[in-house]
């Protein structure tokens, strides 16, 4: 009997009395994006074929033919010679058709005991597992670049902000290490997500399992999975692992976006804390002086793109009854684009961070504005017995006086300070000015998690050790 796969183009066409509409073919075909799964599809098929042979479901000659044919197909794909056909719907049927053309009936036996439902679920998990590992490495590269820059700036003082208002002095190294913490958690989330990705769906078949005496654990071991999906319906129908990865990716991009916002602000001429290397910037077609931080700006925009993919996948799954539905074909493009966006962003950011020029004088000048050591003066009074709320009120009064005069707290003489703060004058001595310096302020935060240079250097050492694990 002539194979329906080669007679009409569809693997299922014998059931139907008329050919599929060309419009429907174009609408339902996924081959021109899911061909990205081709190499993992081949890997999954080879593991499946070896299991079928071991279980005496196919013979050794069939297995040898399948392995020979798949080797040729893999080479054609890698060389860009494989001819993808819209009529064959997807990556799976394109490869199967080519295999059958090369080796004959043995190619038709490969699909014994499986469905495209468990096949594609396996492909996605195999592919995503590798991409998670790649993204983990890129996160480590970015963490390493930030750690290096933090170490170089353990003593560089800048203003810390709340509400974008000057709050307290911090070291630039401490500020950068905050992002190291964020990206470290991102890496942990990726590793955690991988444990749920790394389960084998193959063997679930269409939805109920198969009547053949398959060995799912052998296939899982061959493909490097930690175990098998325990329920066949769940194995083929849920994409929560893809949603979880995309959610973790959205957090990666959220942290990138926050960092990007600061880079843009820091590079602006009115702030001037840093300069980004020319190779990461662009100019203007009309304004000759412009140097635009397009990379961080675009990263902010791409964060919305990944957030959109997360919402798309959540919406995709929310209304589906068990088991597999064609809706799930729509999981791949958001997933593929999320991987590409995150990977490209992390790669370029690691390189860009390594090329940042820091301007310590501008940072220091900004930290001297906005009464950034006011809290230190309050703490000084508290350490001399004044309740904190009373100290807070007294210093707020002093700030108002200095603001009206256009000077900083440190610009007051000792006599002026006592005169303006008569209620606490007896607590103020010559040593107060040491508390009002930027260096004294940051040095006093000398505890784990604090901004002092010594703590920054200790945190750098710990971060490097964590990165090496």
From Swiss-Prot:
Catalytic activity: 2-(N(omega)-L-arginino)succinate = fumarate + L-arginine
The entry's keywords: Amino-acid biosynthesis, Arginine biosynthesis, Cytoplasm, Lyase
Membrane-spanning ranges: none
An individual GO BP term: arginine biosynthetic process via ornithine
GO terms assigned for molecular function: argininosuccinate lyase activity
Pfam family, one: ASL_C2
Cellular compartments annotated: Cytoplasm
Pathway assignment: Amino-acid biosynthesis; L-arginine biosynthesis; L-arginine from L-ornithine and carbamoyl phosphate: step 3/3
EC number: 4.3.2.1
Enzyme class: lyase
GO CC, any one term: cytosol
HAMAP family, A to Z: Arg_succ_lyase (MF_00006)
NCBIfam families reported for this sequence: argH
Listed PANTHER family: ARGININOSUCCINATE LYASE
Record family assignment: Belongs to the lyase 1 family. Argininosuccinate lyase subfamily.
Name of the protein in its database record: Argininosuccinate lyase
Originating gene: argH
């Amino acid at each position: 009997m002539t194979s329906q796969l080669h007679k009409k183009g569809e693997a299922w066409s014998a059931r139907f009395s008329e050919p599929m509409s060309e419009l429907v073919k174009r609408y339902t075909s996924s081959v021109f994006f899911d061909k990205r799964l081709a190499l993992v599809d081949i890997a999954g098929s080879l593991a499946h074929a070896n299991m079928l042979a071991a279980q005496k479901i196919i013979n050794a000659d069939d297995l040898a033919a399948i392995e020979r044919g798949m080797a040729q197909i893999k080479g054609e794909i890698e060389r860009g010679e494989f001819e993808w056909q819209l009529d064959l719907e997807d990556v799976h049927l394109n490869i199967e058709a080519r295999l059958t053309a090369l080796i004959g009936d043995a190619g038709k036996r490969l699909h014994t005991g499986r469905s495209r439902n468990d096949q594609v679920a396996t492909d996605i998990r195999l592919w995503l597992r590798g991409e998670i590992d790649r993204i983990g490495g890129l996160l480590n590269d970015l963490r390493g670049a930030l750690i290096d820059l933090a170490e170089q700036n353990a003593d560089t003082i800048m203003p810390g902000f709340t509400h974008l208002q000057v709050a307290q002095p911090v070291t630039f190294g401490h500020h950068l290490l905050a992002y190291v913490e964020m990206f470290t958690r991102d890496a942990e989330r990726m590793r955690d997500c991988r444990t749920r990705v790394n389960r084998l769906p193959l063997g679930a078949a269409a939805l109920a399992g198969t009547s053949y005496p398959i060995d799912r654990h052998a296939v899982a071991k061959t493909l490097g999975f930690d175990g098998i999906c325990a329920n066949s319906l769940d194995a083929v129908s849920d994409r929560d692992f893809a949603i979880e990865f995309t959610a973790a990716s959205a957090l990666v991009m959220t942290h990138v976006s926050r960092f990007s916002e600061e880079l843009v602000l820091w590079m602006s001429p009115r702030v001037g804390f840093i300069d980004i290397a020319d190779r990461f910037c662009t100019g203007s077609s009309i304004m000759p002086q412009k140097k635009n931080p397009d990379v961080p700006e675009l990263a902010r925009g791409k964060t919305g793109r990944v957030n959109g993919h997360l919402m798309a996948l959540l919406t995709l799954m929310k209304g589906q009854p068990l088991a597999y539905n064609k809706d799930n074909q729509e999981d791949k493009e958001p997933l593929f684009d999320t991987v590409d966006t995150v990977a490209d962003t992390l790669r370029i950011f690691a390189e860009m961070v390594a090329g940042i020029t820091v301007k310590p004088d501008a940072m220091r000048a900004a930290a001297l504005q906005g009464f950034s050591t006011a809290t230190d003066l309050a703490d000084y009074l508290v350490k001399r017995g004044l309740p904190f709320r009373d100290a807070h009120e007294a210093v707020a009064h002093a700030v108002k006086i200095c603001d009206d005069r256009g000077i900083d707290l440190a610009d007051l003489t000792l006599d002026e300070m006592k005169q303006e703060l008569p209620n606490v004058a007896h607590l103020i001595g010559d040593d107060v000015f040491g508390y009002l310096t930027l260096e004294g302020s940051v040095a006093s935060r000398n505890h784990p998690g604090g901004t002092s240079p010594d703590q920054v250097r200790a945190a750098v050492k710990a971060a490097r050790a964590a990165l090496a694990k």
